[in-house]
């Protein structure tokens, strides 16, 4: 439906904005986010999470693995030949992988806002946030590629 597409576009836009604000300073000058860049990053995060929850609820049933896809997945894990004609397995797996990665991305930053973890714990949570964010962006890029490729077959 149109609402799902709009939410997907908003979620991807928020992810792009957060990626640019997070990694541009790090790549350009090896500095962390501060000031307005940090406020933009933090301001788009709740919108992204709300969109992610909506996408999980609205696309979750469509992206469940069917009996044939479970068989294909098991064959691929056991390195057996598997028929992949019209298979949606990788598209569904990247969807669930992306949705799963959104949890540690969100919770690691949320947990680091509390002082119960101490200084070292906050640094560890920040590193978890950085690396899971990078994995999330990579997974979403692969998912969008597979989605567009499947749509324009």
PLM regions and their residue ranges:
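Membrane-embedded alpha-helical bundles that constitute the cytochrome b-like, heme-associated redox core
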Residues: 1-153
């Amino acid at each position: 439906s149109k609402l799902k597409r709009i939410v997907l576009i908003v979620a991807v836009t928020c992810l792009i904005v957060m990626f640019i604000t997070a990694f541009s300073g790090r790549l350009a000058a090896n500095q962390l986010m501060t000031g307005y860049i940090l406020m933009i990053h933090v301001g788009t995060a709740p919108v992204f999470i709300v969109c992610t929850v909506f996408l999980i609820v609205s696309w979750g049933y469509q992206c469940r693995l069917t009996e044939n896809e479970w068989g294909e997945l098991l064959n691929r894990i056991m390195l057996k030949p598997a028929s992949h004609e019209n298979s949606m397995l990788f598209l569904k797996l990247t969807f669930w992988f992306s949705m799963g990665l959104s949890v540690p991305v969100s919770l690691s930053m949320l947990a680091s806002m509390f002082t119960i973890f101490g200084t070292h714990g906050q640094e560890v949570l920040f590193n978890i946030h950085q690396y899971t964010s990078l994995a999330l962006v990579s997974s979403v890029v692969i998912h969008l590629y597979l989605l567009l490729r499947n749509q324009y077959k």
